[in-house]
Curated annotation (Swiss-Prot):
One of its GO terms (cellular component) is cytoplasm. Its main location: nucleus. Disruption phenotype: Leads to the accumulation of pre-tRNAs. It comes from Saccharomyces cerevisiae (strain ATCC 204508 / S288c) (Baker's yeast). SUPFAM superfamilies: ARM repeat (SSF48371). tRNA nucleus export receptor which facilitates tRNA translocation across the nuclear pore complex. Preferentially interacts with tRNAs with mature 5'- and 3'-termini and does not distinguish between intron-containing and spliced tRNAs. In the nucleus binds to tRNA and to the Ran-GTPases GSP1 or GSP2 in their active GTP-bound form. Docking of this trimeric complex to the nuclear pore complex (NPC) is mediated through binding to nucleoporins. Belongs to the exportin family. Present with 3490 molecules/cell in log phase SD medium. It is found in: Nucleus; Cytoplasm. This is Exportin-T. It holds the Pfam family Xpo1. It comes from the Eukaryota. GO terms for molecular function: small GTPase binding; tRNA binding. The keyword tRNA-binding applies.
């Protein structure tokens, strides 16, 4: 049998075995595991001398698996494993063997023993092996090992003692490690085991560790892992055992620990052990007494002196050791800050006593701990610096909170704050080791951003100190930057940036109306001006960090650059500064930079700067008639669109470049129309001739390129090139629009019509023609359809209703596409909703949609049917479907496939489109003769839902709102919307009211109460849906009222047909009808949800 297992295990682990062979071997091994004598078989596999390490490992792993199963976890089986494994282990560890077991096997043995411990130790396990620790101490001759201080002690005995410690560590990890989430039952069992250990074994273990720490140094050097495992044990167990077992009155135990602080092999374990000890939870005053008693600061004085005298003492070789030490000292300081917080929050303590304790703790920090941590923070290794950050966060928060408690509080800390800020300045600088973008990003994330946050807290604590220090730092660097490294200049710009952030966010605590004239603002303006006057030096710099940071600084602080306080005697005027900034952007420093990341970022920032400084730019364009031509000529090389290759997805390998190139098109469009809008000073109306010929300089190359694409035919590269050109034209149109119309008026058609000139309309009519010609050639390609919709959406505000003839053709071409994707239809429906909103009062638009509605609805249904067919085909052919299981709040799992997701999104977009008819008062379209045949289809879509769709609450909300509004607008068969200018008062559709009643009433009651819908009224989204259902019932009641006969068809249907049919009690029926007929809208909705649905749901 053992040979057979060996063959199977080898087959499973052999990389040359095929999948079928491995699967068969695993099945056979599982069969052996399920046999009655499985424990005996795998014990034999472990202890057999002929078993190799792989077989032993597999055997031990299987024993763990078998012991944790209910069938084998019986006293006889556990005792068998206990007896055989401990006997074999004694020979392996203590026998005079030349080769010891590898670590991975020893760890697995520890896991077996830990499993036995968890199943047999303490009264919660039936007291099966309460002598666990005694037996293993005897097995490994622990008493002999710790009582023999002779250097000739048997090495195997020491190894056995080390193994015993590691076993204790694994047990502690199982019962006390807080990083694992355990069940309540498991936690109670672990607590029971810990209580049992406290009562019976912890003192023995503590004594073992104590004796280990007393061993002769030669023995320690013979087996350094023994001391490390001992220290690890103390650090691991200290969180839940009595502290007095480790800390005695004479600190003898602790002194034994301290003696390993300076041993190379034990330093890290010693630091971690002390860290765990000082982190032991105690009451604040007990903790303060404890921290003072252990006298750790005296033990650490050596390290403070060492690093102060020789910072280079920390090297890559010993970095891990120093990181552990830094973490220890940081944690030591944090414990004192926690004491401060706890004392301050204790309501029982006297105020004067609190202040005394806080002052005492603060003095300890300032005198003994902070000087050491400042040295570590100032170290050149980022990892050392970062280890100190948790303490600074706590301590600066303490200073910020208590700065107002005493007039002398801040002055007492001024030296610290001054030193701390100076170190922040130094450690913010990039080092020579940071050479790649990844290096810079890592430094920013781990060090610089945190130091920036610390600076911001210092501003709040002592504004004058911060402003004085940062001003001196920036001034000195600006003065000497030409002789310094690039890192110094980059840091200078970064600190100016930080000063601006502190000023804009008002960390200085100024009145809002004083910020722009305050000293921080004046200082910032001075630095920005000095930086701009260094143009020649800037342009000569070839460093991407500086180039990007400078542009970001200028764009984000434009308001300071052009503020009234910026016009000092030494500063150039606004126009000159503006032109200076433009020239910097349009140079090799920025937009023509040889580095792609700088170039692309500058394209965005250039356009952002133009839009932010709209008023300044408009003034300059009015004074400089040829400026727009100069700018266009300079950046025209960047407007050329080129597709060199495409990837497997059919997109450009340089898509990122094109996406950023669109910012330039937007920016140049913005400048062109802003230039012409500046002529408002002399032009009275939108019809005054204004020259837009400069547009031809941009559009003509694009049109020529499009013509070439049409001539070449539909290759993938040509199609992508056409897509890019159309997107560029649409983005140019967006820039032209926002340059001409104020930002807060871009959607106001009246303002648009007034400000947009006829000459611009003429040019964009030509653009619309070109787009339609291109689209007609390539309309079967979805990215062309996407780009065409995008561009037409940007032309609408400019052409207004003059775009409708073009839109008509566009819609026809899109609907004629045979391969229209669901996401395209979603976008298209949104596009059409925008048209309805903008032109709902236009007769031509009304006629357009009157003709469009039926084919559009048919197209939506066609796509939904295609989605359903695709899903059915995948299911029937067992093809893999991209799925995700979504657990809803009502604990109903819905399998969400791509097709299901597409269908839900399309239905939501469809309902939103229908909503646009009611929102814009054009519901009469739905009642017209031409659309009367499609109306039943639309209404059926709104009253038919699957159980899965009910769970899609966002879609249901839109759908129910549309249904409510339809009932409100034409629920009795006639158009009831008085704002609908196209309604026919003589038109009525008979039977529509009865249809709404018979279809909607069942929905109102079935959705909340039918179990298949899993309607959870306690969940927020479903409660909102319940309010929508109440509104639906109320709208039915209102529209069904007949003032002539005083009858209500809705009430009639409820009381005589539906409610008796579902066997609603008579008293509830009377109450419901009474509330429906007497309450207002909001009152009835609240009653229906809280007192009808919620109450009845409780009885289900």
């Amino acid at each position: 049998m053992l040979e057979r297992i060996q063959q199977l295990v080898n087959a499973v682990n052999d990389p040359r075995s095929d999948v079928a062979t491995k699967r068969q071997a695993i099945e056979l091994l599982n069969g052996i595991k399920s046999s009655e004598n499985a424990l005996e078989i795998f014990i034999s596999l472990v202890i057999n001398e002929n078993s190799n390490d792989l077989l032993k490992f597999y055997g031990l792993s299987t024993l763990i698996e078998l012991m944790t199963e209910g069938v084998n976890a019986n006293p006889n089986g556990l005792n068998l494993v206990k007896f055989e494994i401990t006997k074999w282990l004694k020979f392996q560890v203590l026998g005079n063997k030349q080769t010891k077991l590898p670590d991975f096997l020893m760890n697995k043995i520890s896991e077996v023993l830990t499993t036995l411990f968890m199943l047999m130790y303490s009264d919660c396990n039936g007291n099966q092996w309460n002598s666990f620790f005694d037996d293993l101490m005897s097995l490994f001759q622990v008493d002999s090992a710790i009582s023999n201080t002779s250097p000739s002690t048997d090495g195997n005995i020491l190894l056995g003692l080390e193994f015993f410690n590691k076993l204790c560590l694994m047990i502690n990890s199982e019962i006390a490690d807080q990083s694992f989430i355990r069940s309540k039952e498991s936690q109670l069992k672990n607590n029971n085991i810990k209580d049992w250990m406290r009562d019976n074994d912890i003192m023995k273990l503590s004594n073992v560790w104590f004796q280990c720490l007393k061993l002769d140094e030669q023995i320690v050097s013979q087996c350094p892992g023994l001391i490390n495992s001992t220290l690890d044990c103390i650090g691991s167990f200290i969180s839940w055992i009595d502290i007095n077992l480790i800390i005695d009155a004479n600190n003898y135990y602790l002194q034994l620990i301290y003696k390993f602080l300076n041993l190379k092999e034990t330093k890290i374990s010693c630091y971690n052990c002390i860290l765990a000890i000082i982190s032991k939870k105690m009451k604040p005053m007990d903790k303060l007494a404890f921290l003072n008693m252990i006298n750790l600061t005296n033990e650490l004085t050596y390290y403070h002196q060492a690093i102060s005298m020789n910072p280079q003492i920390i090297t890559f070789d010993n970095l891990e050791v120093w990181e552990s030490l830094t973490k220890l000292i940081t944690s030591f300081g944090i414990e004192f800050t926690i004491i401060i917080e706890q004392v301050n929050d204790d309501q029982k303590l006297d105020t004067l006593y609190k202040q005394s304790v806080i002052s005492n703790v603060d003095s300890i920090l300032l005198e003994k701990i902070i000087p050491i941590l400042l040295e570590f923070m100032n170290n050149e290794f980022d990892s050392i610096t970062a280890k100190t950050f948790p303490f600074w966060s706590n301590y600066l928060a303490f200073l910020k909170k208590y700065k107002a408690s005493s007039p002398n509080f801040v002055p007492l800390h001024k030296d610290f704050l001054d030193n701390f800020q100076q170190i922040c300045f130094k450690r913010m600088k990039f080092s020579d080791d940071e050479v790649t973008q990844d290096d810079f990003e890592e430094f920013n994330e781990t060090v610089r951003f945190k130091l920036k946050n610390f600076q911001e807290i210092i501003v709040v604590i002592d504004p004058s100190l911060f402003l004085n220090n940062i001003s001196q730092e920036i001034s000195a660097n600006l003065m000497n930057c030409k002789n310094e490294s690039w890192q110094i200049f980059e840091l200078t710009i970064y600190q100016i940036f930080n000063l601006s952030e502190c000023t804009k966010n008002n960390y200085f605590g100024l009145n809002k109306n004083e910020i722009m004239t305050s000293q921080p603002s004046l200082t910032l303006v001075r630095f920005l001006n000095e930086l701009l006057m260094m143009k020649d030096f800037l342009l000569a710099i070839d460093n991407e960090q500086i180039q990007i940071l400078f542009m970001e600084l200028i764009v984000k602080n434009y308001n300071f650059i052009f503020s009234t306080s910026a016009n000092t005697a030494n500063a150039t005027d606004d126009d000159e500064k503006y032109l200076l900034i433009l020239n910097i952007f349009m140079s090799s420093f920025a937009m023509f930079n040889k580095r792609e990341n700088v170039r692309l970022r500058s394209w965005y920032l250039f356009t952002r700067f133009l839009k932010l400084t709209r008023i300044n730019l408009k003034k300059i364009l009015f004074a400089n008639k040829n400026l727009v031509n100069e700018i266009t000529n300079k950046i025209s090389p960047l407007l050329h669109i080129k597709v060199t290759s495409i990837n497997a997805q059919g997109t450009d390998d340089n898509d990122t470049i094109f996406d950023n190139q669109l910012y330039i098109f937007e920016g140049i469009g913005f400048i062109i129309t802003l230039n012409n809008s500046s002529q408002e000073l002399t032009a009275a109306t939108a019809n005054t001739p204004i020259d837009y010929d400069i547009l031809d300089q941009i559009l003509t190359p694009l049109f020529t390129q499009l013509e070439g694409c049409i001539t070449q035919g539909a290759s993938p590269v040509v199609i992508l090139e056409c897509h890019h050109i159309l997107m560029a034209i649409g983005t140019l149109a967006r820039g032209l629009h926002i340059g001409l119309v104020p930002e807060n008026q871009v959607n106001n058609m009246v303002v648009n019509k007034k400000l947009i000139n006829d000459s611009l309309i003429h040019k964009f009519s030509n653009i619309a023609e070109v787009i339609l010609v291109t689209f007609s050639f390539f309309n079967k390609f979805e990215n062309i359809r996407d780009a065409s919709r995008f561009t037409f959406a940007r032309l609408i505000p400019i052409l207004s209703n003059k775009i409708l003839p073009f839109i008509n053709k566009l819609i026809e071409l899109i609907l004629s596409s045979t391969d229209l994707k669901s996401w395209e239809m979603i976008d298209f429906l949104g596009f059409l909703s925008q048209l309805i909103h903008m032109f709902h009062t236009d007769t031509d638009c009304y006629q357009l949609f009157n003709q469009l509605l039926t084919p559009l609805i048919n197209k939506v249904h066609s796509i939904i049917e295609e989605i359903d067919e695709q899903h059915d085909q995948q299911s029937s052919s067992n093809k893999p479907i991209d799925t995700a299981v979504t657990a809803t709040s009502v604990n109903k799992n819905i399998v969400v496939t791509d097709s299901y997701r597409d269908k839900i999104l399309l239905k939501k977009a469809y309902c939103t489109f229908l909503q646009s008819f009611t929102n814009n008062s054009v519901t009469s379209i739905l009642l017209s003769d031409i659309n009367r045949a499609i109306l039943p289809v639309i209404l059926n879509d709104l009253v038919t839902y699957t159980p899965q769709e009910i769970q899609e609450t966002s879609m249901m909300k839109v759908s129910l709102n549309v249904l409510c509004n339809f009932i409100k607008c034409f629920g009795n068969g006639t158009c009831l919307d008085n704002d609908d200018i196209n309604k026919d008062p003589n038109l009525k559709i008979d039977g529509l009211n009865e249809y709404f009643i018979m279809k909607c009433v069942p929905i109102i009651f079935e959705i909340p109460f039918n179990p298949i819908y899993k309607f959870n009224i306690k969940e927020g989204n479903f409660k909102t849906m319940a309010y929508d259902l109440a509104r639906l019932l109320r709208e039915l009641f209102i529209v069904s009222s007949n003032p002539t006969t005083n009858e209500n068809e809705c009430v009639k249907y409820l009381t005589q047909i539906y409610l008796p049919q579902i066997q609603l009690p008579q008293e509830l029926t009377i109450q419901l009808v009474n509330m429906l007929t007497t309450m207002g809208q909001k009152q009835f909705e609240k009653w229906f949800v809280d007192n009808f649905i919620s109450v009845l749901k409780q009885g289900q």
